[in-house]
Amino acid sequence: MAIVLNRQKAVEYAQKYWDEESGNYNKLFPHFDGNDCTNFVSQCWNYAGIPRNPNWNVSFVPGATTKSWTIVDDFAEYMTNTSSADTEDGLSIAVMKWDSNEVTIGDIIQFYSESEEHDGWYHSVIISKIDPVYGICYAAHTKHHLQRPLSDVYPNGGVTEVRFICPR
């Protein structure tokens, strides 16, 4: 049986727990101050049907959380490549896409920039809405947002490239 992500459940989770600054985050998970973005999208996908396993997991025990749960590049690598070892059908959980016309709610966006502040892939967010006026909107931790338009940050807001991680 293939792993299936319920996109609506992923968005419901994001809508419920997006505002980390007000303390509205799921207390069943650790919170990584100043660097919680990939932890947040991992929680969204876990709630929506992607099971935790020894290669993609989170823990309150220091050092026990996998990098694939919390680190931008490691999340992308796990979901689009090495997760195939953890699925019954041998396929990765997700695929990488580069075209914004091929995405929908529940997909993950990762931001890239080469600047003094960032050097490479540095931020993960989840698509929370496709708006008829603003287009792709996202929810995020670290810089908390619920329905922020992608157009606010890309291509003219400091983000120079985006990639999309989309469940199969």
Label every model-predicted segment.
Residues D19, W45-N46, E114, I130, ...:
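Residue-level marker of positions within ordered structural domains that often coincide
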Residues M1-T70:
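N-terminal capping segments
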Residues V61-Y138:
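...with weaker cross-activation on analogous glycine-rich loops/strands in unrelated enzymes
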Residues H123-R168:
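Glycine-rich, aromatic-bearing surface loops/beta-hairpins
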